[in-house]
Curated annotation (Swiss-Prot):
Name of the protein: Corticostatin-2
Broad class of where this protein is predominantly found: secreted
One Pfam family it belongs to: Defensin_1
Localization per record: Secreted
Any GO BP: defense response to bacterium
Cysteine pairings via disulfide bonds: 3-32, 5-21, 11-31
Reported function: Microbicidal activity and inhibits corticotropin (ACTH) stimulated corticosterone production.
Species this protein is from: Oryctolagus cuniculus (Rabbit)
Keywords for the protein's UniProt record, in alphabetical order: Antibiotic, Antimicrobial, Defensin, Disulfide bond, Secreted
Entry's family note: Belongs to the alpha-defensin family.
Length: 34
């Protein structure tokens, strides 16, 4: 299980947000499995 950037506003209910990442200057949630 690797943490991934999600190109949407929210992480899934099975994930938790641990920070932000930038993709082309836009911030997205950085999500990890719980």
């Amino acid at each position: 299980g690797r943490c991934v950037c999600r190109k949407q506003l929210l992480c899934s209910y099975r994930e938790r947000r641990i920070g932000d990442c930038k993709i082309r200057g836009v911030r997205f949630p950085f999500c990890c499995p719980r």
